[in-house]
Every structure is written in C-alpha cells, then in structure tokens.
C-alpha cells in the first residue's frame, strides 16, 4: 500500500538530514531503494522545512526510522535545546531523563540506560485533523494503546499549522519503535479511509463529508497582510504602524452556514470571546452574507469562502484562527458521523 508521510524539520535538522553534499539523505535512499524522499526548498525568512517520504508502507516507515537515527547524531557546537520563534518547532514532549527510563525498567544497568537515552529521538509528523481524530480514538483509547504497545510517547498539537488543516503529531522514542508505531498509524488511517469510502458508496443520497476535498497541507511560507508587511512564519501577519494582526482561513462553501450560526450568532460569539474582528467574504450577489443557513449542506463544487481575522495581538488572532479551524473540523466530523449512521440504518433496513 503506497503512503506519503511529511515531517516538519528546523533548518538545522534539515541540514543534518541532508548531510555534506547530500550524502546523508542519499544513504537513506540507498537503504530503502523503493522510497522517494526529499526536503522542501528553503524559504528566505522561514525557520522550517518539510521532509516528504513516499513509497510502500514498510519502506517509508523504515526510511523515517533512519531519519530519526540521523537526527540523533550529535553535531559540533550543537546546543542541547533550541528555542524557536515558530511554535511548532519547539518540542511538545519533555526531554527524557535517566530517571524516566529507570522507572520503566528498574532492572536495567546504568550503562544500558545511558545507551537507550542516547537513542531516543523525535519526529514531528504532519497529519490532517480528520486523520488525527482516528489516531487518537474515542476517549483517547487508540493513542494510549499505541503508546503502551510500542513504548513511545505521542502528543498532538492543539493548534493547526498556518493556512492548513494539518496538526502536528510528535513521536518520541527509539528509531525502531518509531518505525513500528508509524506502521500502525498507516494502518489506522487506511482503515478509516476504507470505512468512509464504503459508507459514502452505500449512502443512497451520495452525500459527501467534504473531508478530502478541503484538506490543506502546510507549506513553509511567510504570510502577508493587506499592507504587505511580512511576519515570521507563525500564523499571522502584522502591520508595524498600527500593531494590527491578521490571518485568513478558507472555509468550504457548504460549511459556512454552520460556522456562522443562526443569524450569525456563532460567529458573533467567536468575535466576542477572542476580541477580534472576523470578516466573512460575501457570496456573489449576496448582500446579507452574515445570515447564512446553518443547515445548508448543498454541494459547493469545491468553492471556498475567505474569513479574515483582525486583532490587536497575535495571541488573539491565533486563538480565533485555531477555534475557527476546530469548529470546521467538528462540523466535518459531525457530518461524517451522520453518514455512518445512515449507512448503518440502510444495512439494518
């Protein structure tokens, strides 16, 4: 089964994976001949790059295990911890200690524990929010099972990466364990997609959840607001003169009504809570664009509406952006669940 995984890297990490004259990344290709692996171009002013690895499941997971090994290799003058301006590059999980390892394996020798500690690494896996819901599972049962089964640590970012529907799943463990947990993650995602396709095919109304059409990948970039002032590659742009921060979120047409709420109340509450202005792009020939029908689920042929968030602080704009994306993800999941129920009712009829 072919898969493609994307990993978020800092500039230092990307340089380490590439190696002198590309030798390190070439060694990963040589060890896993059936994968395509590459790193996005360096964007001036951005502190991150994205590694993409594609191929058969086993080969891709094995190659990413090799990437963890490369990242674990110490570099000259490398600081133990780097603090990054870009939130997603800072580790979500605490650095493991000898005491942590002793607690899980009290019989192990000091030498063995030191060796194990040196082998523990990280991967920042980029995952669509819809897929992450399946990985976490109901009540977090699925992700707990993965942690216990493979002896790794897993944590997901609450926020979406800028201008995307992706979140970060950080994996901490030894390379072999990270490889195994990635194999299970691939299986979970494949099973979920298979069930969704089956439910869609069996649904007499042919209703789409809109999941795949509106997934948006993250790419390293600098955002700009209407005054063309650039920002760090966080999730907002800003104007130095007015201290005004902005962000844009693209929402599928068929979900606009649900996110606006009855007579725009849901959007009004979001504005009030985050202390931001949220401007919704009008539909063509639509003068009353705030009063959308929250139950409108008409197919939209991929049309998107732009929501512009404006605030006096990056924190409030980030909060509004994240909450808007989360509301969209919740609505997509709600419609997905309704589709499943329709399919189950059809089977029992």
Curated annotation (Swiss-Prot):
Database matches in InterPro entries: KH_dom (IPR004087), KH_dom_type_1 (IPR004088), KH_dom_type_1_sf (IPR036612)
Signal peptide: none
GO biological process: chromatin organization; intracellular mRNA localization; mRNA stabilization; mRNA transport; regulation of translation; telomere maintenance via telomerase
Residue numbers spanned by region Disordered: 194-214
Places the protein is found: Cytoplasm; Cytoplasm, P-body; Nucleus; Chromosome, Telomere
Entry keywords, A to Z: Chromatin regulator, Chromosome, Cytoplasm, mRNA transport, Nucleus, Repeat, RNA-binding, Telomere, Translation regulation, Transport
GO molecular function, one term: mRNA binding
Keyword Transport belongs to the record: yes
Origin superkingdom: Eukaryota
One GO CC term on file: chromosome, telomeric region
Ranges that cross the membrane: none
Quaternary structure (record): Binds RNA.
Family: Belongs to the HEK2 family.
Name of the protein in its database record: Heterogeneous nuclear rnp K-like protein 2
Organism classification: Eukaryota, Fungi, Dikarya, Ascomycota, Saccharomycotina
